[in-house]
Amino acid sequence: MGELIVVPTPIGNLEDITLRAIRMLKEADLIYSEDTRVTKRLLNHLEIAGKQIVAFHAHNEHKQLERCVQTVKENTLTVLVSDAGTPAISDPGFLLVRACVEENLPVSCLPGPTAFVPALVGSGFPCDRFIYEGFLPHKKGRQTKWLSIKEEERTVVFYESP
């Protein structure tokens, strides 16, 4: 039986990667990647060659899910990465992690970069109690979402795309 390892990748600075993440990328039999071009750039920077990289992103994760779970079962070590940060945090990956957990496959998540943590810590807002809302809707539902979090007493963290 294989194992799925969720590996956070650097956000902006390629030097912001842990030694353990590098080791997992080196040891991986297969890497599922949000964007194979971005992952290849990271692997080249780390001088890791010869890895099988398969696209797993928002546009194909539903179609690929069953095959991906089967691949995790068959491979010794399968790694999941996103373009930047931790997979499944406002990025693809949640469905694969959940499916592997439901199949009783081992899943590990390495600690590492998540954009909202340094933003929260550096904001000066209270960090002891907060909620994370992900991306706000662009148009439809945006006002409703704002109204639903307006009275929140905890610090509210959300992403805004440029």
Per-range role (PLM):
Residues 33, 91, 159-160:
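Short beta-strand scaffold positions
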